[in-house]
Each structure stands twice: as C-alpha cells, then as structure tokens.
C-alpha cells in the first residue's frame, strides 16, 4: 500500500511539472577578474563574473518546474562544479546545471529545476554569481566565425534571455594589445571535451602571399593533436581580438599527425591571411609548449623564415554561488468575516526569514442540495473558534423541452436557453437549410427535351439542366437606305422561332430618254428584285428646228445641221461667203477681256495675246489638330502696249499674286486646269493632275510683282489704239532639300500683223482720235518676298492628263491622260528675306532709297541618350544640345528729296540716313550624367550624380540714326544725331557632384556634394549722345553725354562638403586687425584717392572631428560711370532712421538659392534746395524677396537670422537718393569657448555711393558695411567714378585636419575729381559664427535627396 502511494505521488509530481519563465529578473553587475595574467581585459579571457537577480514565488512555481537562462555569445562557464543552487537563508530552492556552448552552440545556457523546499507559502529571492568567458571567435568553425562578430572593442551591451524577458547590462571590452600585422595565436580550453582549441594565423602580407609554410607541433611529445578536428582557410581580416571573421578555401597541401600539423600554400590574394586550428590534448592542461613553423613570401618581397616556440599556461577557475532571503507565510484563524494580511517585524541585516501572517475567519463547509425551481437559497449553521461552520446551499434545477429549426450554417447546433422565471428550459436544435436550386436551359442536337438534376454537398447549389432542341429559322429580305448589304440574326429562347433578316441596298436606276411619235412626254419605271437594276424610260417628242444664215470667210456656201438631245432645239446653220471687209472679235475669259479694232493705216501694229489661267483647289481630310481644307490660287498677267511707230510710248506690267491657306494633314488632293486661247485660231487644252501629300507641312512660296510703265502722248493727225496683253506663268516647286521638282510651262504669244485676216463684225467701223498734250511719267516698283519652310514630311504625288480630241473646220479640242507618282523625305529649315526699292517719279524726286532686311533662324536638338553598364553599376547619361542662330540685317541708302524752285534746279531739302544692325547668337549645351551602383548582398549603396551645365550667350546691338536738314534763306536749320551701342557677353558653367555611401552593417552614413559654378557677365559701351542746334532766333545750347560701362569679369563658386560626425560644440573666431592705405595726389585741383582694405577672419585650431566642407568664392566686378551736366549738386544730411535688409543671391541652372542677413541701420539726411539747373541722381536697382526657415544654433546665442528658399525672384524697383548718411551695425552674441575670446574689429568708411556686402558661406557669416556722409556742394562739368571690387572667400573644414581658416578679402578703389574735398570717415564690422555639425549634416543629406 505504501509503495502504491509513493508511485502515485511521483506520478502526480511529474505530471504537474511545467516550464516557467521570468525567474531571473536582472543583471546586477558584470565584472572581470584576471584569472591568468592576461595583458588586457578581453571578452574571451576568464573570468567575467555575472551577478544575476532571481525570484521564486511558491504560488506560481511548484517543485519540479523548470526554467532556462540563455546566454548568447558566452563560450563557457569557468566554474569547477557542474551546477549551482539558488539558495536563500541556507535553503536550496532550485538547482541549475551548466551547459557551455563551446564549439557546439553560439550560446551557453543555465537549466534550473525547482526542488521540494519551495511551498505555496514561500517566496524566495536572491542573487547568483556565474563565472563565464565570452566567445569572440578563435577557430574556423561556423560557431566561432559567427560569434567573432558579437562584440567590438569599447562599450558593448550584453543581453541574456529568460523566456521573453531580456536582461541587459553595458560593459567595456578592451582591444587586443598584440600587433595584428605579425603572427597571431590563441588557445582555449573546452571543459566538456577536456581538449584545447589552438589557432595560428600567418603574418600579414598587404599585397598577398606568393607561397608559404605554416603549422605547429609538440616540443616534448606531451601534446597529442586531433587530426579529425582541423580547420584550414583564409580570412578577410581579423576582429579586434585577432580572430578570423571569415573562412574561405584556397590552394594548400596538408600534413597532419598526432605530433604536429603543417600546410604549404600558394597564391593567397591581397587582404586575406591563412590560418590553421586544431584540437590538442596536452598531458597537463595548465602547462604545455608548442613549436610553430613560420615561412612565407609576400608578393613583391623576399622569403621570410621566422619559426618560434610558445609556452602555454592555464587559468584559475572561479566558483559559482548564490544567496538570498526567504519569505514565510503563516495563517491564524480569527472571528472576523474577512481575510487580513500583516507582516511581522523584519531586520534585513540580521534576520534571514521574512514572515507574513495571514488572518483568516472561521472555516466553513458547504452542503449543496437541489430541487425543481428557480431561486437558490442559503442557510448557515454557526460554530465557535476551532470548529467548522456549515453552509447549506439549495440549488434549483430545470426540466427541458426541445425545439428544432433550420438555419444557414453547415452544421447542427444545440443551444439551451435557461428560463429565469420558470423551471422549464428550452433546447433549440438548429439543422442546416437544404441547398438552393438553379435551373439552366440549353440547346442540344437531339429533337426531344431532357431534364437532369445535379445535387451538391451541404452549403452548395443544386442544378437542374433542361436541354431543348434548336429553334426553327425564318429568313426575310428587306431593302434599306445604306449602300451595302447586311444580315441580322435574331435568336429567341427555346421553343421559339429564330429570324434571319437580310437587308439589301436599293437597286440602281438607269434612266433612258427616247424620242417617240407622240406630241407629249411620258415616264415609265420598271422595278426589279434586290441585286437587280431598276429602269426609268422617258419618252420625249422630237425637237423643233431653227435655221440660221451666217457669213464666213470662204468663197462658197455650206449647210451644217446640229442635232441636240431631247427638249433641245436642233439648228441648221447656212454659211454664205463674206461681202464686207470689217470685223469685230470678242474674246472673254475668266482672267481677261481683250478687244481690238483696226482699219488700214500707215502704222503697223503687232498684237499678240495669250491667256493662261491656273486654278488649284485641295480637299483635305479632317484631323484633330489641323485645319480641314487647303486652297491655293495663282494668277499672273503681263501686258505691253505700243501706240504707233512714230510715238514714244510703251507700257509693260507684270503682276503675280499668291495666296495660300492650307491644313497640316496626311492627304492633299489637287486638281489643276490649264486653258489657252489665241486669237489666231480656237484651241483649248485641258490638263488635270492630282497630288497626295502625307506631311506635317511643306510649302514654297515666291511672290514677284514688277511694274514698268512709260507713257508719252504727242499730237498726231491719225490715231490708233492698240492693246497687247501677254500672260506668262512660271510655277516652281521646291519640295525639300532632297527632292527638287521644277514644273514650268511657257506659252509663246502669237504674232498678228495687218496683213492677216481679222474677224470683224458686220457693224464694225474704224476709230481714230488725236491728242495735243505731252506728259512723261516713269514709275519703277519692285517687291520681292521669299518664304521657305521645309519641315519633315513625306510627299506623294500622282498626276494625270486626259485627252479627248475631236476636230471640225472651226475647233479642235483635246484631252491627254498620263499619271506618275513619287515620294520623298523633307528636312526642316526656315529662312525669310525681303527686299524693296523705290524711285519716285521725275521731276519731283531724284535718286532712290533701297531697303534690305534678312532674317534667318536655325535650330538643332540632339536626342537624349541613355546607357546601362551592369546590374549593380548603372550608368545613365542624358545629353542635350541646342544651337540657335538668329540674325537680322538692315541696309538703308540715302534718299534725296528735291523740289523745283523757279527752274533753277534741284534744291536738297533732306538727307536722312539710318542703319540698324542686330545680331544674336545663343549656344546652349546641357550635359547630365547619373551613375548609380549598389551591392545588395552587403547592404552598401553608393550613388553619384555628376550633372554638368554649360551655357553661353552673346548678343550685340548697334543703332545709328541721323537727320540733316539744309534749307534756303527761309527755312531754319536743325541738326539731330543719336548713337547708342549695347553689347553683352554672358557665360555660365556649372558642375555638381554628389556621392553617398550607406553601410547598414556598421551604421556609417557618408554623404557629400561638390558644386562648381562659374559665371562671366560683361556689359559695356552703353553710350548715348544727343546734340540739338536751334535756329538763329535762339541762343541756348544744351548738350549731354553719358557713358556707362559695367563689367562683371567672372564669378566662380566652388563648394565641396562631406558629412561625417555630429559636433555640437561651438568654436570661437578671431578677427585680425584691418589695414588700409590712402594715396592722395593733387594736380590742377583734381584729387585722386585709392583705398585698399583687407579683413581676414580666422578660426582657432580645433581637434574634434566634424564635417569636411569647403567653400571658395571669387568675384571681380568693375564699373565706370561718366556723367556730364551743366551743374550738379548733392544733398546734405538731416536725422532719420531706416532699417535695411541685405540679401545675397546665387543662382545655378533653373533654381535660385537665397540667403539673407538682417542689418540694423541708422541714417540722417537733410535736404538743401538745389539750383534750378541741378539734376537729382537716382540709383535704380532690383531686389528679390525670400522666405525660409530659422535654424537654432546649438551651443550659442546668435540673433542673426538665416533664410533659405528655392523660389522664383520677384522684381521690384527702389530709388535711392544720392548721399544719405548710413551707419550699419552687426550684432553677434555668440558664446565663446573657454580660453578662446572673441574679437571684433570695426571700420567705418564714407564714399560717393553707399555699398554693402553680405557674404554667406557654408556655416559662416561675414558682413562688411560702409557708410557715407554728405558731401559739400559740387559744381563741375564732369564727374567720373570707377569702382572695382574683388571678393575671395574660402572656408575649409577637414576631419583629418586640426584647424580651419576661412578668409574674406574685399578691396575697393574709388577715384573722383571734384572742386572741394570730401568728408571721409571709416566704419565697419566683421564677425563670424560656426553652425553645429548636425545642421550641416542635415543640410547635406537633404541636398543629396533633393538633387
């Protein structure tokens, strides 16, 4: 019986044991004790003592429960015992076993089991000390290679795990003091195997190894080598404790025995080091000796032979221990109705047990009975202290009734609904609903109907398929309004009838007209079936006949019958010989009307006429972005007239007019008709062709208009009038630069003399007239316009010439048919030229005026290109080249206006002459390069962006205008001349380089940018001269000359910035004393002044590693102004206060970056009335507004506000009155570092024009201000001022350097000539402050992602 009880107890104990977590709650300390005379505190050297806090609560932990502490990167426990007890007050509450990871796992663990001393009334807590050694590598095994990356020299975080609870502490590990370039050795004892792992790494060869031999062996035979546990490889570097971090295979030969192991290797690449490790078993682990073979040859070096011997000794183990306190809970019965808890007095320094007393009421026992009902009743039988009270509980129970219903679920459910007011409960049973049914009707090939039912599983859908035979079909044919046939099939449901409707177009109709014998007309229509032809027969009575008698030139008579169609009139023409010799001929055309009459005269008249008409029309298909039609018309006429042989009169005119309106479409159809009519006979020729052009546009237009007319009339006894009209057309088409197609036709005029027979009218009579007036007029007018546009197009053309010839004694008509086609490609170009000349009629005007204007424009754009090199190194290159050339030339010659004055000849009244030359050249080249490389396996990314932008522009403008007027004794003399010249030359070059490297393993982020911008702007020779000479009645002479030359030679900005480590400590800058020199020379009351000033801002040496950045600015500006006036005055001073905000703007490519500093200024000015002839000199300039963000300066207080924003500039104009008094101050309250005081140097200077410069560099602000005081009144014929300014700013910071020294230099030279001396003072200030490195880092990273 006792044995059975014992077995049952053991079974219940093991059955209820469980795994618990959260027992270890902290790492209280982690300290190192030198157990083997080690040279440094390395993580792998014993012993590291970890003190951990623990707590066991008997209410949640039971005997037999287990818990585990995992210790990553721990190599072994260095204790002599195999386990440690968790003890409190001398009582063991749990036992923990040591499991060292060694070469087996990357972690060690502590597995604990709760023993029987822990009861539910006990809560024990305490600490345990664990002696350990960490694993930071030491062999080529996978476990050691992984743990070789656990820690680095310096501060590390050690983390242990108890279930989901992590215990961490910070600890400092020292780096190995052994030189990594020499040979490296390590030995570690593995208690579980009772063996030692020995490592040997060959000395370092930076360029690699040509060959070598390495190994180790026992010196006295007391060490056995395990050849089954050997690792050989090459490692790419070692960690901070000289252990391999990688292992790769290479070429070697191995020799191994129980006495020694060695390898011979060849050709090890640079950056790798060979190593060998093996397990050894010394006879005494605390003391043994090994001999090492060390022969090697580095690349490009000599053979090295350096064997050595090492004696190894062991270390002293540390013991694990535990201590803690016990909390005991006791229970006492009281008469209270509730339970109370109290703690007895406890002194932690003396007592080892903490007692908690639980006060409980009298215990009770409960008896439960049941009955059919609704409510529960309670009754209590009391008892004194020491006995047990009884509580009787009468619990009701209910009977049930079952209800079954259907639901949408897939299973059957049973739910009991308790009735709170009755003793009968309801049991609801829900069964799934039956599946829904879907009926589908289909056609099939059988002639009968079939039904099939398909039943699916629960929650599915059952299907009923009804199969019906196909419906019969009825076909109907109909006529419809379309020109094509179509068939429509109407399918009905089963048991219906399908319909096929065939729609046919209406039959064509043929109409036939016939004569018949009746006197009335009738129409008969014959209609056929579809696809036939309907007939309409019209029957007409015969036509009436009209007989006409005419004269003709033959000597015999003839009869001609002309029969026409129905409803017409037939004609009978009788031709009789001519009896009179007079005629009239009328010829009409759409272009001209020529009539002539003549009779015998002593004059011989030659008359020729040729009429050529050309008309063209085009119909173009519509498109979404082009006009829908095109029309072109060309008319040309030429006429010449000769009055008689003895008169000096001739007239010749030629007029050509072109109008064009076309659409840009893919098809153009042209139809052109030519006709020719000559008075010698009746001949008509019709030529028709069509062309199709698939193009964007292609046109060539030439318009020529010339007119030469001379006329002179003299008295003659007999008069005659002859008009000759000649029409000539020349059509020239230039389709493209590749295809030139010229089509020309020339129709010579026929010559008619008096000996020819002319047609005359019966009533025609000769006409004669005479004239006695004489007039002479010469008019010459010429206008030439040429326009050529050849965009890219494809040209297709086809032509046809139709001929149908029929002949009769009086007419000949012919049509000729031909066709051709061709296509070509048209290249783009554009040119425009215009010229005109004018000569006015004698005797009112002489000489001539010619005007010439030409304009050309060419443009070329290079297509972008893109290239890719590899998957991990992509190179994208974008290139764009745009060349634009535009030139305008104008030539104008002199025109002389004359008027006749009493017959004395021509008097010159005006000789205006003007010349305008303008030339503009623009050359823009844009090159952008983007290089991206990435290596996803190592989580390193590198991005480089090297855009390059070069832009240059040259423009020149010259204008000259003069007017001269010369008159006789009455007209006054006025002379005006004006000359202005403007030229400018702009050049801008920009180069930006951005690089970024990110390494996710080490957490390093490097971002940098380099920007170079060079600008050259030159604006010179702005000169304007005006002179006015009045007549003799006025004596005032006014002249003014101004010559302003401004030249900005070059501006170069180079910025390079690399961001590495944040530095929030401010630096203090000192200012070197300023120096200036003045040179005064006096020559004929002319005083010259030269001022040179240099201000240098230096920084004190810094030793912290901050940001690598540099900024250099070079700017040279020169301006010269010369002003001549009759009188000049300045303004004296009066008190006033103003506030000035200085802004400096730098632009690159298509964006502008602005920075601004706020300067407080005080000024005073007083107005003095100027003489009536004085002129106020005003300076107009543009400002740009900027808004931005204010960045706080960590570590210093500075009221300087820096603003930056990429925004388009807004132009505004302000007017500055000459000679205000300006005093500028700059406040800087930056706090200085210890022993580095700040210095500020102030300089004040007053010159003719106020000037202020604000240079904002990368993290530095340098401000120089100038002030001006009023000048005395100056009366001078001229004032010349020349100002040259050069700014060089360079700011460099280098993480490897120990200091940085920015320098700012401003030089200014002013020269003035005046009658009275100037009042000159000097004032200025300069200061600088350094922004913390975090701001530079933020800006650089933001700039990188922005670009």
UniProtKB/Swiss-Prot annotation:
It is a lipid-anchor; GPI-anchor. The gene is ALS5. Changing residue 1283 to T: In allele ALS5-2. This is Agglutinin-like protein 5. Residues 1-19 form the signal peptide. GO terms for biological process: adhesion of symbiont to host; cell adhesion; cell adhesion involved in multi-species biofilm formation; cell adhesion involved in single-species biofilm formation; cell-cell adhesion; cell-matrix adhesion; hyphal growth; single-species biofilm formation on inanimate substrate. Keywords: Cell adhesion, Cell membrane, Cell wall, Disulfide bond, Glycoprotein, GPI-anchor, Lipoprotein, Membrane, Repeat, Secreted, Signal, Virulence. Changing residue 311 to R: In allele ALS5-2. It is found in: Cell membrane; Secreted, Cell wall. It comes from Candida albicans (strain SC5314 / ATCC MYA-2876) (Yeast). Disulfide bonds join 73-150, 96-112, 205-298, 227-256. InterPro entries: Adhesion_dom_sf, Agglutinin-like_ALS_rpt, Agglutinin-like_N, Agglutinin-like_N_N2, ALS, Fibrogen-bd_dom1. Forms homodimers through the tandem repeats. Aggregates in amyloid-like structures, with self-propagating secondary-structure changes, amyloid-characteristic dye binding, and induced birefringence. Each ALS protein has a similar three-domain structure, including a N-ter domain of 433-436 amino acids that is 55-90 percent identical across the family and which mediates adherence to various materials; a central domain of variable numbers of tandemly repeated copies of a 36 amino acid motif; and a C-ter domain that is relatively variable in length and sequence across the family. Cell surface adhesion protein which mediates both yeast-to-host tissue adherence and yeast aggregation. Plays an important role in the pathogenesis of C.albicans infections. Forms amyloid structures, essential for cell-cell association and cell-substrate adhesion to polystyrene. A lipid is attached at residue 1326 (GPI-anchor amidated serine).
